[in-house]
């Protein structure tokens, strides 16, 4: 059987409340699904998690040389410090929707003051030079410093996986864009007044009452 996808188009003739007819079109593609495979960043994360020497690198003052076997790897920019909320951070990954497929880069060049939207636009493919990279975990988030980022010309659409609360709470999708559906604030937060000058947090639950942590 052919591995090439087959495409068909269905046409529906419908009637509105005034009796007027109109058409709706539905395109259906049939073919062999090829699941995503672990990419270069995913393999890097696997190396970090499997390296017992790096387990003690907690906090920037305990950063350790990465000493990865690959001097350069390819990645996609997932997010930058456009609004100053990701202070000096650049989020990069394989952009395949898999768990453990992204990591945070930390450095002064990624700061909002250096116009990261122009220099490091989300969706752009990049090459990461890891020869002098150092690793540490900050608040349980995996980070690299001293990474040289070369931005390419190719831009791709970001893959945003939809997660259950259980999957999100594992922490395996850190540094990635994700989507959670049907989330609502806990009842204790409903109707609560907010002020722009206060730091506040909200507990979110899914439709079954499971809490996002």
For the regions a language model picked out, list residue spans one by one:
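Short, exposed coil/turn segments at beta-strand boundaries within extracellular/luminal domains
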Residues: 16-25
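Extended non-catalytic accessory segments flanking core domains
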Residues: 25-213
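A short beta-strand micro-motif common to beta-rich folds, especially ectodomain repeats
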Residues: 5-16
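Surface-exposed, short loops/turns at beta-strand junctions within beta-sandwich domains
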Residues: 2-7, 120
